Amino acid sequence: MIGQPAGIIERAFELAQRSANVEEIRFQLRKEGYSNVDGHLMGRKIRADLVKVIRRVA
């Protein structure tokens, strides 16, 4: 998989390790050119999992 961009969910979890909140992750994903960011991150479970990563690193 070298050279292939990360999928949006995988990239969201990478960003969670150095983000302050989910909105910051959304902003960065849009900036990186990912589409349908809100659709991918709207679920309660995915948001809760991202917050867990953010809090664990903080």
Language-model region placement:
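Short, charged amphipathic recognition helices of the HTH superfamily
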Residues: 17-30
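Short Lys/Arg-enriched helix C-cap and helix-to-coil transition segments
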Residues: 39-40, 52-58
